[in-house]
Amino acid sequence: MGKKLVMAQKRGETRALCLGVAMVVCAAITYYVLGTTVLPLYQKSVWTQESICHLIETNIKDQEELEGKKVPQYPCLWVNVSAVGRWAMLYHTEDTRDQNQQCSYIPRNLDNYQTALADVKKVRANFYKHHEFYCLSAPQVNETSVVYQRLYGPQVLLFSFFWPTFLLTGGLLLIAMVKLNRSLSILAAQK
């Protein structure tokens, strides 16, 4: 009976040790992936200066109003603000500016025009409720645009690195507990 218990204990310890090592390896791989994808995007972002934006005007540009230019197939919200002592065009995120420089906000659902228009009107109403809000600007003097939020800000970075850190800590604790259990069982066997 005693030999079977020792064998089962060793098998369980081996499995727990393998689980701990697997957790540490997965955390290392996740750190590598995040370090090569999210971290460079965070470091590349120039939108670092936080300021207070004052709403000047908003306008919903429709397909008819954009004649002669590349016409988007969705309603376009254009927001003009005063930030850091100058007039600026507000963009929802950095990607919004890259997708269409004429639009401050691009609706999520572009399949249905009426749903997209309702979404744009809802966002416009929120701007009228809050005339002052925080925005991010680039430190360059001649920059005439600001963003409402960064895609890869400090919160996203913290949340992205939380789970691999949790996995790494759990794996290391599991390995430490197995090693402690082995050393305590050796000490108990010597007595």
UniProtKB/Swiss-Prot annotation:
**Protein source organism:** Mus musculus
UniProt keyword terms in alphabetical order: Glycoprotein, Ion channel, Ion transport, Membrane, Transmembrane, Transmembrane helix, Transport
Superkingdom as given in the UniProt entry: Eukaryota
Tell me which residues are glycosylated.
80, 142
Q: In which tissues is it expressed?
A: Expressed in many tissues containing smooth muscles. In brain and heart, it is not expressed except in the vasculature, such as cerebral arteries, aorta and corona arteries.
Q: What is this protein called?
A: Calcium-activated potassium channel subunit beta-1
Q: Where in the cell is it found?
A: Membrane
An example molecular function term from Gene Ontology annotations: calcium-activated potassium channel activity
